[in-house]
From Swiss-Prot:
<protein>
    <recommendedName>
        <fullName>Large ribosomal subunit protein bL21</fullName>
    </recommendedName>
</protein>
<comment type="similarity">
    <text>Belongs to the bacterial ribosomal protein bL21 family.</text>
</comment>
<comment type="function">
    <text>This protein binds to 23S rRNA in the presence of protein L20.</text>
</comment>
<dbReference type="GO" id="GO:0005840">
    <property type="term" value="C:ribosome"/>
</dbReference>
<dbReference type="GO" id="GO:0003735">
    <property type="term" value="F:structural constituent of ribosome"/>
</dbReference>
<dbReference type="GO" id="GO:1990904">
    <property type="term" value="C:ribonucleoprotein complex"/>
</dbReference>
<dbReference type="GO" id="GO:0005737">
    <property type="term" value="C:cytoplasm"/>
</dbReference>
<dbReference type="Pfam" id="PF00829">
    <property type="entry name" value="Ribosomal_L21p"/>
</dbReference>
<comment type="subunit">
    <text>Part of the 50S ribosomal subunit. Contacts protein L20.</text>
</comment>
<dbReference type="InterPro" id="IPR028909">
    <property type="entry name" value="bL21-like"/>
</dbReference>
<dbReference type="InterPro" id="IPR018258">
    <property type="entry name" value="Ribosomal_bL21_CS"/>
</dbReference>
<dbReference type="InterPro" id="IPR036164">
    <property type="entry name" value="bL21-like_sf"/>
</dbReference>
<keyword id="KW-0689">Ribosomal protein</keyword>
<dbReference type="GO" id="GO:0019843">
    <property type="term" value="F:rRNA binding"/>
</dbReference>
<dbReference type="InterPro" id="IPR001787">
    <property type="entry name" value="Ribosomal_bL21"/>
</dbReference>
<dbReference type="GO" id="GO:0006412">
    <property type="term" value="P:translation"/>
</dbReference>
<keyword id="KW-0687">Ribonucleoprotein</keyword>
Length: 106
């Protein structure tokens, strides 16, 4: 069984047992978190699809928090001897999907 969930403004296709990185969540490592905004559920019988499936949820365990690799930004003005360098490291939360519960379409 798989599901499409929404967190941090992004959509993720997940299955039980998978580990993935999502935008930073304010939950301590080792705690459980429940995602209620599920857009799609799928299994061998077919799919359930909708804006938000009523009663559907995905539970996950927070494995760790961290920061992604550095992205380097360079702004350059030609012929003006001007260059600006900047770096950014995005915070993320690594989660492990522990369960997917089905629901009815809203």
């Amino acid at each position: 069984m798989y599901a499409v969930l929404v967190t941090g403004g992004k959509q993720y296709r997940v299955a039980q047992g998978e580990t993935l990185r999502v935008e930073k969540l304010e939950v301590e490592a080792g705690n459980e978190i429940k995602f209620d905004t599920i857009l799609m559920l799928g299994d061998s019988d077919g799919i359930k699809l909708g804006d938000a499936l009523k009663g559907a949820s995905v539970t996950a365990k927070v494995v760790a928090h961290g920061r992604a690799d550095k992205v380097r930004i360079i702004k350059f003005r030609r012929r003006k001897h001007h260059m600006k360098r900047q770096g950014h490291r995005q915070y993320y939360t690594e989660i492990e999907i522990t369960g997917i519960a089905g629901g009815d379409k809203k």
